[in-house]
């Protein structure tokens, strides 16, 4: 059995075409969705991610504004800029590219963004609303993962979902989203003994740790769905995920590739949240 590939690239194209139509409708009503992106320092990976986000915004007709600051900016100055953008009615979404320099507290930055403009879905208010099932901006990568699984026609209710990884950005929230869909959810992490014994129980295995090819065929139950969130650069310069794709695709029923899997969906969900923020702010 060779797994079916769930292509994030293809699914993202379809969703972005729908988003472009929605954005055009908003513009026809005099509302131009605007996303402000704040970039601190000169980390090459961060610059690359931001370029990708700007390009995607242009693709669907969202106005993107980039604010770049040196790594030496004080936390106070950065928070003042965020508060200025909170008050700007032409800005519907605010995104601060992570990671930040060590002297700036990440939580302080996230909590300063107005919850109604928190298109990353990281603000504690949005996280809390997600936990109790109230409408909220969902974090982009976990939401993208859920949409990918649903797009393949996979029934989630009653399935055992194992999440490897417990970050605030992916691991923790993705488990909660699948719990909301009536899955039984188990978390595994660096302190989990005998990882394979846990992951082999998964009907749906979601891996988000940032360790190249951590998951091999011995970790996967035959016929499982495997979602690879990790992005790692090998010494050769080639990108690979947390899953040994070539080996695991011979065991799984569905698998996501890296690149071309979860990545394009993360940015697509960011566009979705920005469009939704513009719609909600316009309705007020």
From Swiss-Prot:
Pathway: One-carbon metabolism; tetrahydrofolate interconversion. GO terms for cellular component: cytosol. GO terms for molecular function: methenyltetrahydrofolate cyclohydrolase activity; methylenetetrahydrofolate dehydrogenase (NADP+) activity. Keywords: Amino-acid biosynthesis, Histidine biosynthesis, Hydrolase, Methionine biosynthesis, Multifunctional enzyme, NADP, One-carbon metabolism, Oxidoreductase, Purine biosynthesis. CDD domains: NAD_bind_m-THF_DH_Cyclohyd. InterPro entries: Aminoacid_DH-like_N_sf (IPR046346), NAD(P)-bd_dom_sf (IPR036291), THF_DH/CycHdrlase (IPR000672), THF_DH/CycHdrlase_cat_dom (IPR020630), THF_DH/CycHdrlase_CS (IPR020867), THF_DH/CycHdrlase_NAD-bd_dom (IPR020631). It catalyses: (6R)-5,10-methylene-5,6,7,8-tetrahydrofolate + NADP(+) = (6R)-5,10-methenyltetrahydrofolate + NADPH; (6R)-5,10-methenyltetrahydrofolate + H2O = (6R)-10-formyltetrahydrofolate + H(+). One of its GO terms (biological process) is tetrahydrofolate interconversion. NADP(+) binds at residues 165-167, 190, 231. Its EC number is 1.5.1.5, 3.5.4.9. Belongs to the tetrahydrofolate dehydrogenase/cyclohydrolase family. Catalyzes the oxidation of 5,10-methylenetetrahydrofolate to 5,10-methenyltetrahydrofolate and then the hydrolysis of 5,10-methenyltetrahydrofolate to 10-formyltetrahydrofolate. This is Bifunctional protein FolD. The lineage of its organism: Bacteria, Bacillati, Bacillota, Bacilli, Bacillales. The gene is folD.
């Amino acid at each position: 059995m060779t797994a079916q590939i769930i292509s994030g690239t293809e699914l993202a194209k379809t969703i972005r075409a729908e988003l472009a139509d929605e954005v055009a409708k908003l513009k026809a009503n005099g509302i131009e969705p605007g996303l402000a992106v704040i970039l601190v320092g000169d980390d090459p990976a961060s610059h690359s991610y931001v370029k990708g986000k700007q390009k995607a915004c242009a693709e669907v007709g969202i106005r993107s504004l980039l604010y770049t600051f040196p790594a030496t900016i004080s936390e106070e100055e950065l928070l003042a800029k965020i508060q200025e953008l909170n008050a700007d009615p032409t800005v519907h979404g605010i995104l601060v590219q992570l990671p930040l320099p060590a002297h700036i507290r990440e939580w302080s930055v996230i909590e300063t963004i107005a919850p109604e403009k928190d298109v990353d879905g990281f603000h504690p208010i949005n996280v809390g609303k997600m936990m109790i099932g109230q409408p909220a901006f969902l974090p982009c990568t976990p939401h993208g993962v859920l949409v990918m699984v649903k797009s393949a026609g996979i029934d989630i209710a009653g399935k055992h979902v194992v999440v490897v990884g417990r970050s605030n950005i992916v691991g923790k929230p993705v488990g909660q989203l699948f719990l909301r869909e009536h899955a039984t959810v188990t978390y595994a992490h660096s302190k989990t003994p005998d990882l394979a014994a846990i992951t082999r129980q998964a009907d749906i295995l979601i891996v988000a740790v940032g360790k190249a090819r951590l998951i091999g065929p011995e970790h996967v139950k035959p016929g499982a769905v495997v979602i690879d969130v990790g992005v790692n650069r090998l010494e050769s310069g080639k990108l690979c995920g947390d899953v040994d794709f070539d080996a695991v695709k011979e065991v799984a029923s569905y698998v996501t590739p890296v690149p071309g899997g979860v990545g394009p969906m993360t940015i697509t969900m960011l566009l979705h949240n920005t469009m939704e923020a513009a719609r909600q702010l316009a309705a007020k």
